[in-house]
């Protein structure tokens, strides 16, 4: 009887460990996003902060409003959720910009980029032509 109880206990521990591992396999990480005016040039975050000088601060401001870190566009979440949060905030900023009228910005390409942690390069997540 003790052997059966021990076997059941070991099996229960193994199942619990497996469930715990699978539940934590998609842990939250920090993902960084920037807004740029050109999707063909590799840009670092410091360069993209000049985006505000180009007269379109509202997009970046909308993204910062939803960011997990003040002053930056960083989401601590799973990759899929972080990309979705960034795209939603980007879309909100574009919508607010359009509400105010895009004027001379018509035809301008605005790009949302996300950092690929594996390659340390910025990848285009979303692109909008005003």
Descriptions of predicted regions:
Residues 11-12:
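Repetitive helical segments and hydrophobic/amphipathic motifs
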């Amino acid at each position: 009887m003790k052997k059966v109880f021990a076997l059941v206990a070991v099996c229960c521990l193994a199942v619990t460990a497996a469930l715990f591992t699978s539940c934590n396999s998609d842990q939250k990480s920090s993902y960084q996003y920037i807004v740029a005016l050109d999707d063909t040039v590799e840009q670092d975050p410091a360069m993209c902060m000049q985006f505000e000088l180009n007269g379109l601060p509202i997009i970046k401001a909308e993204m910062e409003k939803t960011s997990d870190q003040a002053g930056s566009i960083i989401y601590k979440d799973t990759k899929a959720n972080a990309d979705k949060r960034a795209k939603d905030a980007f879309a909100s900023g574009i919508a607010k910009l359009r509400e105010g009228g895009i004027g001379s910005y018509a035809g301008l390409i605005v790009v949302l980029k996300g950092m690929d942690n594996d390659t340390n390069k910025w990848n285009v997540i979303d692109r909008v032509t005003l």
